[in-house]
Amino acid sequence: SVRQANITSQYYESESRLLTKYYQLDSQNLEYSLENLQIEYQKEDDLYMLEDKINDSQVLQLSFVQENDSLKIISLKTINLEE
């Protein structure tokens, strides 16, 4: 259906924006690059999370960690927002 195609398209656009931000990050200087690129993020312990709004009811969240001198993606998940 057209609606499903739109939702799929929104998801991939959101994924593309998140991955673009992720690959711009400097693993050697992570905190600085997050601030310098003005990327909003959350941090819990060693886990960093970037989010991008898919539509009015969903957000896509990319989680990653810094290991040695590199970044490693842990998950990419859709989160339903409360109605």
What are the residue ranges of the model-derived segments?
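Beta-strand/loop motifs with alternating small/hydrophobic and polar/acidic residues, enriched
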Residues: 1-83
